[in-house]
Amino acid sequence: MRIGKRRKMSGELRVRRVSSWEFDLILREAEKYGELSHEFFSIVEGEYRDVYAVNESVWKLVEKLPLKPYSLGTFVGTIRVDDNLVEKFYPNIEFFSLVKVTKNYAVLGPKASFLFTTGKDVPKRAVKKLNWQGSRKILIYNDLGDIIGIGMINPRNDEKFIKNLKDVGEFLRR
């Protein structure tokens, strides 16, 4: 759990619980892959609305603090308006540790997993297991069961069958 002081920004940060509309956005994203196993989220509003998974006991402590934190719990994604002016929840990889994944995932072997975590796309022959139910985005696992990223499936291209959208090695490449 990370609780820190408020960042100096041009606008005021606001910490609050998620609204029912925001929770619905989070729930809809989780349902593309399985079942959400966590129910308590908070929002830190600044330039974007950052979503954090917290538990109720932590939230009760935060409510009593004289200074509001700029982050708390586990950062799981951001809610923002897309190019079509539609409000969406954009999850990060950590979000999926809160989802019981049952669909829209691929399992890669060791070599393909390594290449995926270096930003490479995945050919169809490197996919050991595929559970795809129509979603364009799929979760990528290594053969040990670790989530290593998020990809976009391209059924028309066997060489770039899964396009790398986000992976756990991204942070190290910055």
Curated annotation (Swiss-Prot):
One of the record's GO molecular function terms: RNA binding
InterPro entries for this protein: NIP7_N (IPR040598), PUA_sf (IPR036974), UPF0113_PUA (IPR005155)
Family assignment from sequence similarity: Belongs to the UPF0113 family.
Protein name as it appears in the record: UPF0113 protein PH0281
Biological source species: Pyrococcus horikoshii (strain ATCC 700860 / DSM 12428 / JCM 9974 / NBRC 100139 / OT-3)
